[in-house]
Amino acid sequence: MLSANYIKECLKDAYKLPIEGVCKHEFVFDGLINDGAHDDVHGATTLDVAKRLLDFGFHAPTIYFPLLFHQALMIEPTETESKETIDAFIDVMHKIAAEAAEDPRILQEAPHGAPIGRPDETAAARNPILKFKDAQ
């Protein structure tokens, strides 16, 4: 509970917080803060933020859920994470927000160091390859 509230308070200046107040163990942002004219910031979406987190060694959080929010980014930190790790996550999230404002292509082309970039997720869901031999 403490970790989630700490992260939320540290990041609410860069990410839209649709529900104010104390959270239990998770909270949801609704995309990056912008001028209110668009659902994304300079073309950077929640998916872009999640993919960019991979470049910094952080597991991407749950995205686009709950469906109540168009650019939902659900943050669920474990209470066993050290303050150093939580602060590093906060720093990375601020860096990603700054990148979205300066050059959104950095986010749109992420992840940069992964062996697989951005697979066609719709095709993968419709035609899953369940055996390694089928992938060859």
Show where each model-derived region lies:
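Non-catalytic terminal extensions of PLP-dependent enzymes
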Residues: 3-136
